[in-house]
Amino acid sequence: MPFFPIIKLKFESVVGNILTLEYIFVAKISMSDRVRVRFAPSPTGGLHLGGVRTALFNYLFAKQQGGDFILRVEDTDQTRFVSGAEEYIIECLKWCGITPDEGPGFGGEYGPYHQSERKPLYRQYAEQLVNNGFAYYAFDTPAELEEKREELSNFQYGHAHRKEMTNSISLSQTEVAELLAKDTPHVIRLKVPQDETISFDDLIRGEVSFETSLIDDKVLLKADGMPTYHLAVVVDDYLMKISHAFRGEEWLPSAPVHLLLWKYLGWEDSMPQWAHLPLILKPDGHGKLSKRDGARLGFPVYAMNWKDAKTNELTQGFREIGFLPEAFVNLLAMLGWNDGTDQELFSLKELIEKFSLERINKSGAKFDFEKARWYNAEWIKRISKEELNQQVLEVFKAKGIQVADKNQLAQIIDLVKDRCTLLTDFIAQAGYFFHTPEEYDLGSVKPKWTNEKESFFIAYGAILNVITDYSAPSLEVSFKALAEEKGLKVGDVMLPFRIMLVGGKFGPAVFEISSLLGKDETINRIQNGLNLLKH
């Protein structure tokens, strides 16, 4: 059942001549309103796994409640806009199976879904706030602001200093009108009240409180007419009828600014209920996981590969190193959530059924790459043969490995999948079925190589040439019989045979390999091995 907040005012105390108010945001239940959540990324680069988890939790909650998941692109900061980033974000969501009900390319009646296309709306509401005394024009130049910061190390553009600055509070109405008439560059700032306590009920953290004396007068509308995040998120959430807002814990300090905007715009009864998600922490638990941490520790932090258009720097993604989308979604869900049981493997459908806000942790979740690899290994065993075959085929294609016989590929995958943690492991574990080994571990064979062993393989090649039953059991019988006939221990010729076939001391049962390679290829590899061992 969806929850929607209303606002109540509690008169707390009068100290001297200052009235202290506490705004308490509490929830009321609405039986008629539909759950609507949004994922609102900025198209500024690769999508961090924390961002994907935010999208996932929004999606799980919406689908469980029979609601809508909206994709909204927050592209108001044009200085940070990166071409191709939006398409990348959509592709990431698609890979994870997270399909928006509304958004760019998905339709919907509450568009446009790019904030850059909603610019006139923000100006309208910013001016409304000014007219009602909740915001003001500020004409300070960047140089003047910098000078003030140098003068006062703890400078905060708020109630303590706003009258010292160039704005519609310190200036007369005539002066303000003249500046506006001249199109003097200006911003619109929120007028944060003094000495008030703002509290709200977070769906994860319970009651959270803030003192307004610690909050500066945030810019709502920039000099170029574009809104800041603070104004845009409130206006868009209201107009798009967002019922619940899930976002990372790092946005918690912005909550009081947004609460004030909901109140000042007169939209208290429509304000969404918030849930601030725990951070994804570095493996040691000290600090938020960053892109640099991944590079330093050798694992990705992006969902998919991201190439910086300016530097051409390529940052690896989970998809490209060989993660299944099912495993990636599963591990993300378990970063800060569990269903209260020992179950660890969940399909997207199961996550939708079992997801609950009550089971989200307040504290941050350590990222464990080895655990992530475990999830992937388990999902390689769990997904259908058809799906796994297709995934491996895509990996092979990306590496230029040609597969002519898909039935043979299916047999090979079934043979080696228990040895694979990542999809890319199939290249090492199965690539030799489709091309001769590029390297051979001859150092493990040459020291003990003898004329007797060479004679054995020449004879075994001749046997293979005429054998009719090329099954693994038949090959094993003939191999062992010949070894006995030649007076050799099976173990003494088994390792050379494996290295001739695959290049190293790895892989499944050697006769299974030989059977799948086929008669001609096995004979060719034996001959190639003999030639290499002569040098």
Predicted features by range, described:
Residues 137, 141-293, 300, 314, ...:
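Active-site cores that bind ATP or allylic diphosphates and position pyrophosphate for catalysis
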Residues 147, 154, 175-183, 385-390, ...:
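Short, glycine- and charge-enriched coil/turn segments that flank and shape catalytic ligand pockets
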Residues 58, 89, 129, 133, ...:
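Residue-level signal for inorganic ion chemistry
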Residues 268, 273-440, 502-535:
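Catalytic adenosine-cofactor/nucleotide-binding cores of aminoacyl-tRNA synthetases and other
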Residues 37-43, 71-75, 240-246, 310-315, ...:
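Glycine- and acidic
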Residues 445-501, 506:
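C-terminal accessory/binding modules appended to enzymatic or scaffolding proteins
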Residues 23, 29-154, 253-265, 327:
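N-terminal Rossmann-like or analogous alpha/beta NTP/dinucleotide-binding catalytic cores
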Residues 1-30:
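N-terminal amphipathic/basic-hydrophobic helices that include classical n-h-c signal peptides
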